[in-house]
């Protein structure tokens, strides 16, 4: 086996390398295979996160003194008297605040004071702490000296040289600055006196520790919720939410491959709400004891990000072939988009991190909230939304199977009007909603907060302290493994002190910046328990700990149950596949009840009905979906000579053609409906096509039966089927000047066509538009006159004809009679050429495909060649043809990225060559090729002499060798066959038996597989019989007197026909069949 790739003038062997399943593929496949279980698990986990945040909010509202306070905003100092605060300032120089001595002494003093407070019943509600930088401090020592009384570590420098040295060490705008550790206590009015007594007594008992550090008579100030956090005009926010819900719903309405539009819209809103509350819960658990974030805009920003991720996943899943199983489609879509979604998340987190250096603390807190929300939302998107989407696709496939006529495609009258505002769903808007929204709102918050503080727009100066505190907060868990107590940003709001400090420093403007305390990163759990023994804090701590532990236990139990019930892989544990998403190579024999070799096979267009005729002159019609026989005709019931067999597009009727008579049989209610004579030359071969006509209803149908003779004569019959019976009449007759090599039917959206390739090299296309058939000879390419035509193949829905020449293949648009593209291919053997297109769909009047594949036998080397033209990106597509806007063809939604549209020159070429096979058959999507070859039981392929010797014993040649032209019984033939078997057994003294194997190649997974075929009889077979594609992933190959259906992509064989093994579906189908049989039993007899 040799695999190589050609693309844009370069060879890339890595393109054909097998792609191993990633962790994301295993994860998504596991969820999509058991969606309801994971929906339950993630719902419980979300409830735990939401409930803990509601507990925090309820505790904050329960205490009236906290109902109007928020620690998220620390800059506003104008407030009403609701909460009394006491602030103690531990001041020092900008350099000393980072020294180990300063931090140790500050922490020791704070711990001692809190223990002292605990002895008196801890009369304060809580304490809030922050690091404060006050700048600028003038360069002159005389102006700074009055502030020195607030420093506890050391006095300020006594000479100007040291002042200049200090100024060089500063990090705040290049000026000298004064740093402080502020302890803010929020007290109830009745607790103020007690707090004063305890504070004075503590200071008097510790004269050597911070004797001059405090303002011994702290000013009573007020904390409040600034105007920015108060929600005015709720109806505007609710109206915006309703509008956003409508926009998202209409976006999903335009996705016709999604069934539950309202359900998925609600899922995204619920998922965003879960992320919002879970973020509040996480921040509350690790840091905050105040109310939850009061900004409604944060919720909508989370929704915008969910829209980005959801539509990225939806586009990938819709672009995957619909014939694959739902878990496989989810797996491929999630695996292809997880990297893009994760990179988008990283970009947003990096942007928020950079912005945090240039915004005020309240906006920093908002950035922190958004960052945490984005992470939680990303995790929920990859779990909860993934499971809900898999359920919805399953329901859509069930609905399409049960009643395709009741599809909701364009079912709403107002859907076409969305085309006028389609710019609202442009790819750029959908892909950048979250990015644009959070940038705009962060800028808005910075503008409003800076206006409140400075009176004008201003960015904060970059300060390294934010990075230091962030590092310590992360290191608290990852490195030091110490738990940060329930602390939030403090509040620096003593107007008296600020005014006094402003006068003493003679500074016109004081810029105040608050930061979380670095020193508190050294507080461990034991010290926290000893120090923070407030009733509110202890209760909050217990609730948060309980629900967080429950969160982890739920997830662990879910994984354990999943592993015990089904295992990590939902495939058969006895399977030889080692990876979870590696799909099955399946061979299923069809017991078609033939006793001799099968000569002819046929399948309906909907892959529902399969028919076969053998040397025993028996006809068997098989229902592939129900896996049962529908019609069996014995030799006595069949015509003496059978020239052709054909099934109608729906698989309900079968036509048989003898040398001068045609028969129409009903397959559903087995009976002969019609018998009619026709003209046919004695030695000519027939090719018969059913063309759809006018259908008034299920009780009156019209077809056109086109009979093509190899001599060049074409007859068109009009067939009408009613309840009372059927009628047929010859309506057209054509005669070509030379014999026909090959003829095909093309039932396109615009016309019914028959294309014929003659021995003279002409390609004549007969088209019916309206009541008249009109012929036309194709002559678009100048090479037509000089090169020999080898084969033709059509893509019906695209109205495209592929013409194989000596030097390549031409793709011709039959609608416009135009040459679209020429592919350079090696010489093709006659009647071995086939074409497949993957993921075909109609979008906005365009017929789009993801790839084009050619499979044929080389005319010189007799080797099977497979050419694939596509792109590694699963969202890329090619436009084969375009039509005017028509309701039955047009999908209003455009699920594809317009940037992913490729031209034929941009396609990558992948070539696969099978050296030890001479025949093959390709699936209709062009992604799988199958073949059958013979080898000995020892695994060695037979030699040419062995093949020639076996040709004498094959039943296929038995008719010519024994002279049984008019068979009247099976006995003489079977007796002769048993004698030949005995001779064969004596000839092969080694006792070797024939072994056949099926080989396949999967372009989608770059895999080559072989599997031995079980022999169900003792027939000696030289070559396999006819073969044809049965579905997008399945083919039928004849071997002797039985048919092997070969597929790749599912362990359950019925999955190849887009049927799911559901008990509910089986019950519905059985009920519908019984009703149909009762209806027909009274009108049509067998």
Curated annotation (Swiss-Prot):
Membrane topology (Cytoplasmic): 1-35, 251-265, 312-337, 389-422, 566-1086
Sequence ranges on the Lumenal membrane side: 57-229, 287-290, 359-367, 444-544
Species: Schizosaccharomyces pombe (strain 972 / ATCC 24843) (Fission yeast)
Keyword Lipid metabolism found: yes
Traits of the deletion mutant: Cells show absence of mature sre1 as well as inability to grow in the absence of oxygen.
Assembly mode: Forms a tight complex with scp1, composed of 4 copies of scp1 and 4 copies of sre1.
Outcome, altering residue 685 to E: In Scp1-M3; strongly reduced interaction with sre1
Protein name: Sterol regulatory element-binding protein cleavage-activating protein
């Amino acid at each position: 086996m040799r695999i190589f790739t050609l693309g844009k003038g370069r060879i890339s062997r890595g393109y054909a390398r097998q792609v191993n399943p990633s962790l994301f593929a295993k994860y998504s496949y596991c969820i999509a295979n058991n969606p309801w279980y994971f929906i339950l698990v993630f719902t419980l986990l979300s409830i735990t996160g939401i409930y803990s945040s509601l507990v925090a909010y309820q505790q904050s509202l329960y205490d009236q003194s906290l109902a109007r306070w928020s620690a998220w905003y620390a800059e506003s100092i104008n407030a009403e008297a609701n909460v009394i605060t006491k602030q103690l300032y531990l001041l020092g120089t900008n350099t000393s605040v980072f020294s180990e001595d300063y931090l140790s002494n500050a922490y020791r003093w704070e711990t001692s004071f809190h223990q002292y407070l605990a002895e008196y019943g801890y009369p304060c509600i809580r304490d809030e702490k922050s690091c404060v930088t006050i700048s600028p401090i003038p360069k002159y020592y005389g102006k700074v000296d009055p502030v020195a009384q607030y420093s506890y570590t050391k006095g300020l420098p006594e000479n100007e040289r040291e002042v200049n040295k200090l100024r060089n060490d500063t990090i705040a705008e290049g000026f000298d600055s004064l740093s402080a550790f502020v302890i803010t206590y929020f007290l109830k009015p009745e607790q103020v006196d007690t707090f004063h007594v305890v504070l004075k007594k503590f200071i008097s008992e510790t004269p050597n520790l911070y004797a001059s550090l405090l303002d011994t008579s702290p000013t009573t100030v007020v904390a409040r919720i600034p105007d920015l956090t108060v929600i005015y005009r709720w109806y505007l926010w609710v109206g915006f939410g309703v509008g956003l819900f409508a926009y998202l719903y209409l976006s999903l309405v335009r996705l016709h491959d999604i069934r539950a539009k309202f359900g998925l819209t609600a899922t995204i809103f619920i998922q965003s709400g879960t992320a919002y509350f879970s973020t509040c819960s996480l921040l509350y658990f690790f840091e905050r004891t105040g109310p939850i974030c009061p900004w409604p805009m944060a919720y909508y920003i989370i929704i915008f990000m969910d829209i980005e991720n959801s539509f990225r996943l939806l586009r990938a899943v819709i672009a995957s072939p619909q014939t694959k199983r739902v878990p496989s489609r989810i797996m491929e879509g999630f695996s292809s988009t997880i990297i893009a979604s994760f990179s988008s998340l990283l970009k947003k987190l990096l942007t928020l991190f950079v912005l945090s250096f240039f915004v005020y603390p309240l906006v920093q807190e908002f950035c922190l909230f958004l960052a945490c929300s984005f992470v939680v939302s990303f995790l929920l998107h990859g779990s909860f939304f993934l499971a809900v989407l898999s359920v919805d696709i399953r329901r859509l496939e069930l609905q399409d199977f049960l009643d395709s006529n009741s599809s909701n495609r364009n079912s709403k009258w107002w859907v076409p009007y969305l085309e006028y505002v389609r710019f609202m769903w442009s790819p750029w808007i959908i892909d950048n909603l979250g990015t644009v929204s959070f940038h705009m709102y962060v800028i808005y918050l910075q503008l409003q907060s800076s206006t409140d503080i400075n009176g004008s727009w201003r960015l904060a100066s970059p300060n390294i302290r934010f990075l230091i505190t962030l590092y310590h907060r992360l290191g608290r868990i990852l490195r030091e493994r110490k738990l940060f107590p329930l602390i939030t940003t403090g509040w620096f709001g003593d107007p008296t002190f600020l005014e006094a400090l402003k006068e003493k420093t003679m500074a016109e403007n004081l810029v105040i910046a608050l930061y979380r305390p670095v020193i508190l990163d050294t507080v461990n759990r034991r010290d926290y328990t000893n120090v923070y023994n407030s009733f509110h804090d202890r209760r909050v701590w217990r609730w948060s700990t309980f629900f967080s532990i429950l969160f982890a236990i739920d997830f662990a139990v879910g994984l354990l149950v999943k592993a015990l019930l089904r295992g990590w892989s939902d495939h058969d544990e006895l399977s030889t596949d080692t990876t979870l998403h590696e799909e099955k190579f399946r061979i299923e024999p069809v017991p078609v009840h033939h006793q001799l070799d099968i000569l002819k096979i046929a399948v309906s267009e909907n892959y529902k009905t399969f028919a076969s005729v053998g040397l025993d002159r028996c006809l068997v019609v098989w229902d592939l979906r129900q896996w049962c026989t529908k019609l069996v005709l014995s030799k006595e019931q069949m015509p003496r000579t059978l020239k052709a067999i054909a099934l109608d597009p729906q698989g309900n009727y079968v036509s048989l053609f003898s040398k001068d008579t045609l028969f129409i049989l009903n397959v559903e209610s087995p009976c002969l409906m019609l018998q009619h004579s026709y003209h046919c030359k004695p030695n000519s071969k027939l090719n018969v096509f059913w063309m759809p006509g006018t259908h008034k209803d299920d009780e009156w149908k019209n077809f056109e039966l086109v009979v093509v003779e190899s001599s060049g004569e074409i007859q068109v019959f009009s067939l009408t089927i009613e309840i009372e019976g059927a009628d047929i009449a010859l309506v057209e007759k054509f005669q070509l000047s030379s014999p026909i090599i090959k003829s095909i039917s093309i039932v396109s959206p615009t016309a019914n066509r028959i294309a014929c390739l003659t021995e003279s090299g002409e390609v004549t296309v007969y088209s019916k538009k309206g009541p008249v058939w009109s012929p036309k000879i194709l002559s678009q390419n100048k090479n037509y006159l000089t090169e020999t035509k080898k084969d033709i193949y059509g893509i019906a829905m695209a109205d495209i004809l592929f013409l194989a020449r000596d030097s390549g293949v031409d793709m011709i648009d039959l609608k416009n009679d135009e040459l679209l593209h020429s592919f350079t291919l090696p010489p093709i053997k006659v009647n071995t050429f086939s074409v497949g297109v993957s993921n075909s769909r109609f979008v906005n009047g365009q017929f789009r495909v993801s790839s084009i594949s050619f499979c044929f036998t080389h005319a010189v080397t007799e080797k099977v060649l497979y050419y694939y033209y596509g792109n590694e990106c699963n969202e890329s597509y090619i436009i084969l043809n375009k039509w005017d806007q028509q309701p039955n063809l047009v999908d209003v939604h455009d699920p594809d990225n317009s940037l992913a549209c490729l031209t034929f020159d941009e396609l990558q070429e992948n070539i696969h060559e099978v050296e030890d096979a001479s025949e093959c058959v390709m699936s209709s999507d062009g992604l799988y090729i199958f073949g059958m070859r013979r080898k000995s039981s020892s695994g060695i392929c037979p030699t040419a002499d062995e093949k020639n010797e076996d040709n004498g014993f094959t039943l296929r040649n038995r008719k010519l060798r024994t002279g049984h032209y008019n068979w009247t019984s099976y006995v003489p033939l079977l007796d002769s066959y048993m004698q030949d078997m005995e001779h064969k057994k004596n000839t092969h003294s080694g006792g070797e038996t024939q072994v056949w194997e099926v080989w396949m190649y999967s372009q989608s997974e770059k895999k080559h597989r072989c599997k031995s075929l079980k022999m169900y009889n003792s027939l000696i077979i030289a070559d396999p019989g006819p073969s044809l594609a049965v579905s997008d992933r399945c083919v039928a190959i004849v071997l002797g007197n039985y048919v092997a259906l070969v597929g790749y992509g599912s362990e359950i064989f019925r999955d190849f026909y887009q049927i799911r093994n559901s008990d509910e579906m089986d019950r519905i189908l059985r009920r519908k069949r019984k009703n149909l049989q009762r209806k027909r039993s009274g009108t049509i007899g067998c």
